């Protein structure tokens, strides 16, 4: 009701994968489309929002990262570069001399806030943390709904106390990055348990996210008290997503997923590949901070891909990826709705 959408189905915002076309298709079908803008510059974020608004008159959400910025630990970085050096050398390359912070945080960049205030999408969501009070106040005054991901009750209560409108309950099954605020503490709660926990202790609407691929699963989450569901992995295969051919192929052929922090510096669930089998070992050095580690992973993947080795890609996927179906976004939304009604 707050979002004025027909169906309680959200497209998960996926940085690097979501496109204005995909967002618009979901919104035009009565769901809530989304743009994952955490990896964008303010200028490109603005362009994506305007393009989406040209493709749909319906509501959609935009998403940004609220990670705590940290200085690069030079010693950690050196050890990590040395550890990955053999993988670069295998392709006749050398790792870079230094690592860069490739993703600025919304917390440090009011240019992102100004883009949102200027373009006025219906809703804005945040991952890894909560925006500053002045940012929340500005969004509220502009009439823009705010949403933040929570992976545990402590985060959910902090979100509610901050004056945010909606809580996204991200379970351990979810593909991509854990929205966890403090990486040293992860209760690894599954989506269904998390939804019930937050519904019991908080008054805000809760959106269930993580491992949802079918209308039956969506219906189950709504039955537990969720106001809506958010799906990401199910939509990555759509033609209008920005996923590579290799990523799409992996979604349909490799149903094993694993959580690792070695790709980006933060824990994220993806399809099992070299990062999990060759890089992650009990004796490996501790990776540098997010997003410095991601800078290196992207460079290694680019080099390996030129040699037709796609095992270093960030093929994010949820734990139920085996249930993925080849459907275009409008058809997938319709199918989910039919399944939700059929299961009544």
What are the residue ranges of the model-derived segments?
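Active-site entrance/lid segments in N-terminal catalytic domains of soluble metabolic enzymes
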Residues: 1-201
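Conserved active-site-proximal phosphate/metal-binding subdomains
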Residues: 177-207, 212-344
């Amino acid at each position: 009701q707050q979002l004025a959408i027909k169906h309680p189905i959200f497209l998960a915002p996926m940085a690097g994968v979501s496109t204005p076309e995909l967002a618009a298709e979901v919104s035009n079908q009565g769901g809530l489309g989304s743009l994952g803008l955490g990896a964008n510059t303010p200028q490109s974020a603005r362009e994506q929002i305007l393009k989406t608004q040209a493709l749909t008159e319906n509501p959609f959400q935009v998403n940004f990262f609220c990670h705590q910025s940290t200085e690069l630990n030079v010693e950690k970085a050196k050890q990590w570069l040395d550890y990955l050096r053999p993988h670069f050398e295998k392709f006749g390359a050398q790792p870079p001399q230094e690592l860069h912070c490739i993703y600025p945080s919304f917390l440090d960049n009011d240019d992102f806030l100004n883009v949102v205030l200027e373009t006025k999408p219906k809703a804005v969501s945040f991952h890894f943390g909560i925006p500053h009070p002045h940012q929340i106040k500005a969004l509220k005054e502009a009439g823009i709904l705010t949403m933040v991901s929570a992976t545990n009750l402590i985060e959910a209560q902090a979100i509610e106390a901050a004056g945010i409108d909606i809580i996204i309950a991200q379970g351990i099954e979810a593909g991509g990055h854990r929205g966890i605020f403090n990486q040293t503490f992860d209760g690894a709660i599954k989506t269904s348990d998390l939804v019930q926990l937050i519904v019991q202790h908080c008054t805000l609407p809760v959106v269930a996210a993580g491992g949802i691929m079918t209308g039956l699963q969506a219906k189950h989450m709504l039955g537990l008290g969720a106001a809506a569901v958010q799906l990401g992995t199910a939509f990555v295969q759509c033609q209008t997503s920005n996923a590579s051919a290799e990523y799409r192929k992996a979604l349909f052929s490799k149903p094993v997923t694993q959580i690792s922090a070695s790709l980006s510096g933060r824990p994220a669930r993806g399809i099992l590949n070299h990062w999990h089998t060759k890089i992650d070992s009990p004796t490996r050095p501790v990776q540098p901070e997010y997003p410095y580690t991601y800078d290196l992973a992207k460079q290694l993947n680019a080099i390996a891909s030129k040699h037709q080795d796609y095992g270093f890609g960030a093929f994010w996927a949820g734990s139920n990826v085996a249930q993925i179906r080849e459907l275009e976004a409008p058809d997938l939304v319709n199918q989910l709705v039919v399944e939700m009604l059929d299961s009544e």
